[in-house]
């Protein structure tokens, strides 16, 4: 029995990301740092959407006590993966904005991509020091706890840096900054 239809949005997101993946990877691309970062962003988003759909289906088809007894460990590990993927997506986006802002960063990107990878691994390792708390709000199962605080903090830092870099380069009138401005607008609207 379905408690709620909360899995529909993640499922549609997964389908949309699959279509985007097929369209993006079916075309030939120029090998530049921006495209490498976009590859990471789009693949991470797809993996996250599929895993999110699975977690939401589990939560929508089971009672809270069953989720806590049978699926807690899977959901806990899934949330570590979500946290890492969100961090990868937002740090890749921040790196993308820095690269398009500083011409010299093209050369430095190949050297610094290893540093970015090390930061991702260190962040992922740090997630093992925290667990999640599952809470039931009506028919919906939500996640809270120190793991989420770590995730929100890391993502907020990346968003702030992205917005600062974009605002510092607003005079360039480069359409590549549009995603950062759209994120800022969405954050203002949703508050």
Question: Where are the regions that the model predicts?
Answer:
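Extracellular-loop-to-transmembrane junctions of the mid-late helices
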Residues: 2-14, 123-168
């Amino acid at each position: 029995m379905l408690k709620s239809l909360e899995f529909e949005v993640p499922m549609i997101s997964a389908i949309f990301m699959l279509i985007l993946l097929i369209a993006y990877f079916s075309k030939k691309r120029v090998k530049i740092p921006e495209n490498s970062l976009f590859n990471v962003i789009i693949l991470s988003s797809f993996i996250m959407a599929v895993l999110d759909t699975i977690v939401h289906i589990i939560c929508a088809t089971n009672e809270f006590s069953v989720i806590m007894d049978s699926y807690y460990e899977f959901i806990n590990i899934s949330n570590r993966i979500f946290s890492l993927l969100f961090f990868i997506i937002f740090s890749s986006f921040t790196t993308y904005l820095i690269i398009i802002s500083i011409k010299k960063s093209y050369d430095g990107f190949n050297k610094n991509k290893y540093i970015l990878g090390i930061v991702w691994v260190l962040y992922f390792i740090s997630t093992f020091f925290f667990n999640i708390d599952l809470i039931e709000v009506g028919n919906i199962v939500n996640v809270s706890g120190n793991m989420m605080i770590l995730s929100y903090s890391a993502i907020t830092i990346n968003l702030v840096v992205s917005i600062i870099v974009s605002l510092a380069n607003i005079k360039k009138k480069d359409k590549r900054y549009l995603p950062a401005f759209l994120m800022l607008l969405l954050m203002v609207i949703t508050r």
